[in-house]
């Protein structure tokens, strides 16, 4: 120990003692304030506080912009019906009987290649306890409502142009308006026009204008369940341009601002990863200014853009999984829903060929459902039986557990699994989606979980993030 250290140590000790004394005095004053009349301690809570209300106000003011941004960007699921698929029909092939034709052809495929529950279950590997339930419900669905979401295609699936495309777009509008008048329209219907890339931009805008104008002329208003699909989006600026286009149409016809929403189709690598390394799709959702309703994965265009050979272009390819995972994270909490792509292996030909295609399609749909992609594309009537079989088996297999856990959560009952509010939302959403598509009945769900439909919806779609305490 040096002479300098010996001389300075008493002074340092004295300073430390003074600091300790000031801290004790400060703490005593804080406790006095906390225990003063009118505080929480005086109100019988039995706790003491140190922070004055001004600190709460300061923190609230600091985070007010964040609170507003969370509400704007992440409003949660809209709570509307979610179709289990989107059926694409070329614009020149659409007729007034298209939906009924798809249902009849799907039923005919079952009659020919799986005429009873046992044979259908054997082909797909449906457990015996579910076989009859699933088969009966699939046939009823194909008879009652074979298509939940119809997209009239004026893009890759369409070969017209010029005056022919004008006429087909106008005819599509007349047919859709008529279907809504007579009650035969699908719950969701719309068109996919050409994209906004320079070579086809004007054509796409013209087709969309003809279709929307025709709906107003023949229906008096835009129908409920109207859905537009914007394909081959690579830059967020293309989404902004589409928003401006819809704003102009709404102003022209005196429609409520924001009336027309649309889906963004992810078919290019640039839509997933921008040149600067950021996730473009997240910026696209923001650029949609609240109009985006879905992100649809384009299996074959996206795979081709990455150089995947034709034989390996499928919705379960690792490249597809990566793209959809990015889409899923970008869309989470925004109210924008993610839709899986399609399979181009069609159930046609011999019974053996049909069964092979059915097994493939059924497996892809079940795989997507397990990954929370609750919607996908169907390109052929023969895919409807396996779409609904996969969906119904998924919801019915998880029905008893989901209903029991949600009922236990609602009653705060004990159980083998401790569920949190987020899990309760997922359980309620699972049951509601099952009811909406026909996999479950409202009555059996109410009995199983003890919750009436309105309470079930309240659990499934609380808006605004974390509930207050």
Descriptions of predicted regions:
Residues 23-27:
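Low-complexity repeat regions of mature extracellularly deployed or surface/particle-associated proteins
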Residues 15-17:
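Compositionally biased, intrinsically disordered low-complexity segments enriched in Pro/Arg/Gln/His
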């Amino acid at each position: 120990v040096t002479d300098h250290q010996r001389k300075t140590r008493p002074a340092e000790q004295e300073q430390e003692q003074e600091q300790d004394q000031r801290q004790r005095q400060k703490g005593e004053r804080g406790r006095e304030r906390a225990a003063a009349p009118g505080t929480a301690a005086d109100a019988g809570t039995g706790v003491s506080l140190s922070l004055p209300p001004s600190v709460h106000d300061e923190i609230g003011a600091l985070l007010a912009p964040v609170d507003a941004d969370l509400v704007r960007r992440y409003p949660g699921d809209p709570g509307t019906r979610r179709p289990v698929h989107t059926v694409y029909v070329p614009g020149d092939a659409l007729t007034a009987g298209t939906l009924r034709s798809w249902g009849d052809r799907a039923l005919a495929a079952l009659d020919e290649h799986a005429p009873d529950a046992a044979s259908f279950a054997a082909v797909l590997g449906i457990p015996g306890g579910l076989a009859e339930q699933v088969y009966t419900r699939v046939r009823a669905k194909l008879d009652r409502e074979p298509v939940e979401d119809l997209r009239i295609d004026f893009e890759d699936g369409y070969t017209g142009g010029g005056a022919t495309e004008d006429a087909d777009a106008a005819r599509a509008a007349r047919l859709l308006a008529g279907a809504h008048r007579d009650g035969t329209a699908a719950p969701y219907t719309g068109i996919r026009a050409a994209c906004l890339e320079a070579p086809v931009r004007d054509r796409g805008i013209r087709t969309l204008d003809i279709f929307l104008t025709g709906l107003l002329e023949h229906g008096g208003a835009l129908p409920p369940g109207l859905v537009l699909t914007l394909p081959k989006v690579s830059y967020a600026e293309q989404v902004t341009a589409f928003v401006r286009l819809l704003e102009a149409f709404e102003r022209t016809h005196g429609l409520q601002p924001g009336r027309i929403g649309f889906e963004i189709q992810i078919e290019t690598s640039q839509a997933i990863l921008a040149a600067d390394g950021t996730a473009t799709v997240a910026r696209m959702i923001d650029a949609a200014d609240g109009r985006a309703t879905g992100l649809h994965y384009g299996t074959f265009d996206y795979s081709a853009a990455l150089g995947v050979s034709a034989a390996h272009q499928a919705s379960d390819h690792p490249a597809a999984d990566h793209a959809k995972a990015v889409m899923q994270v970008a869309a989470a909490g925004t109210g924008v829903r993610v839709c899986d792509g399609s399979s181009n292996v069609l159930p046609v030909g011999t019974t053996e060929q049909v069964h092979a295609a059915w097994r493939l399609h059924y497996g892809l749909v079940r795989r997507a459902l397990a990954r929370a992609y609750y919607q996908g594309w169907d390109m052929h009537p023969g895919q409807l039986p396996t779409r609904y079989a996969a969906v119904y088996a998924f919801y019915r297999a998880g029905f008893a557990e989901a209903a029991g856990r949600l009922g236990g959560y609602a009653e705060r009952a004990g159980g083998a699994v401790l569920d949190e509010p987020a899990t309760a939302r997922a359980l309620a959403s699972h049951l509601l989606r099952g009811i909406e598509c026909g996999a479950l009945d409202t009555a059996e769900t109410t009995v199983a979980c003890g919750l009436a439909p309105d309470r079930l919806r309240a659990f499934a779609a609380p808006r605004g993030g974390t509930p207050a305490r």
